[in-house]
Curated annotation (Swiss-Prot):
Homodimer. This is Phosphoribosyl-AMP cyclohydrolase. GO terms for cellular component: cytoplasm. The keyword Ubl conjugation does not apply. Its main location: cytoplasm. Its cofactor is Mg(2+); Zn(2+). It is found in: Cytoplasm. Pfam families: PRA-CH (PF01502). It comes from the Bacteria. It is an enzyme of class 3 (hydrolase). One of its GO terms (molecular function) is magnesium ion binding. Keywords: Amino-acid biosynthesis, Cytoplasm, Histidine biosynthesis, Hydrolase, Magnesium, Metal-binding, Zinc. It catalyses: 1-(5-phospho-beta-D-ribosyl)-5'-AMP + H2O = 1-(5-phospho-beta-D-ribosyl)-5-[(5-phospho-beta-D-ribosylamino)methylideneamino]imidazole-4-carboxamide.
């Protein structure tokens, strides 16, 4: 039985669900390729593959909001990864929120329900 995710599926990109190790709150959804997987295992820090920039990146490399791995789970088909992490800085979202899922959809409207931890204009000065 293989112990690694099956990167032969989905053009080598697998979805990664990221949860807080403290309270199981869903923080974000990202993608990993085999390189990101191995870098994550080597460093103990979450690394992902950016589909838009087409490059490897470490979560928090610009913001300092690094994700330290506490536990890794794989689904039954070995094609989805669940990371339980300790989120440094309190924000997983590049918009400055604790979770990327900071908006609730109801009655055809979006309502901000998450807590903003930082101003992205201050953190990502480009």
């Amino acid at each position: 039985m293989t112990l690694d995710p099956d990167f032969s599926k989905n053009d080598g990109l697998l979805p990664v669900i990221v949860q807080s190790a403290d309270d199981d709150k869903v923080l974000m959804l990202a993608y990993m390729n085999e390189l990101a997987w191995h870098r994550t295992l080597e460093t103990g820090k979450a690394h992902y593959w950016s589909r838009s920039r087409r490059k490897l990146w470490q979560k928090g490399e610009e913001s300092g909001n690094v994700q330290t791995i506490r536990e890794i789970l794989l689904d039954c088909d070995l094609d989805t990864i669940l990371l339980k992490v300790v989120q440094t800085g309190g924000a997983a979202c590049h918009d400055g929120y604790e979770s990327c899922f900071y908006r609730r959809y109801a009655d055809g409207k979006l309502e901000v329900v998450g807590k903003r931890v930082f101003d992205p204009k201050e953190v990502y000065k480009k």
